Amino acid sequence: IFNNDSLSQLERIDGIIAIGKFSSKQVKELEQYSPALVFVDSDTLDQGHSCVTTDFEHAVTHVLDHFLQQGIREIGMIAGREETTDGTTSIDDPRLACFCRYLSDKELYQPAYVKIGKFSSESGYQLMKELIDQQKEQMPKAFFIASDALAVGTLRALQEAGISVPQDVQIISFN
């Protein structure tokens, strides 16, 4: 079964491995076909289902520590918004939450250095252009980018503005 294919076409299901972001309604629909559910990339522990998710906390803190160890204190983020596959529920990006919390704890968080849009190269491009226009000489020295697609657009905007990576600004992207 892929994406929005109908589960009703299946006569017998022993278990389901569901990949993606799912709303509570979608989880309940899947439960009707099999109690043996495992979710990948969707935290469903609070709904009583096993799941496999990325340890964003470790990844984000590792990246931020890398920047901090280099003496970089002005760190920005280009993030994206996600939603469930049925489009009914917005999902907070755990990378962004961790980024804000970690830098706030160190009294280094600058809201003006954070931009949020869609997970696309075009969005990365537009968000970085906005940051360049708004910050001018006050640009962060490093950026944590929440996806490779966003990073592609970010790099294009930096290149167009004559900002050299990694000489002027460092970036690390993590999907």
Where do the PLM segments sit?
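Periplasmic-binding protein-like
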Residues: 10-19, 76-79, 114, 136-147, ...
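Alpha-helical recognition/docking segments in bacterial nutrient-uptake
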Residues: 1-65, 69, 133, 137
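A structural micro-motif
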Residues: 35, 49, 110-112, 163, ...
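Venus flytrap/periplasmic-binding-protein-like
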Residues: 38, 104, 148, 157-175
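Hinge/beta->alpha junction and helix N-cap segments in small-molecule ligand-binding domains
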Residues: 1-3, 52-62, 78-129, 145-152, ...
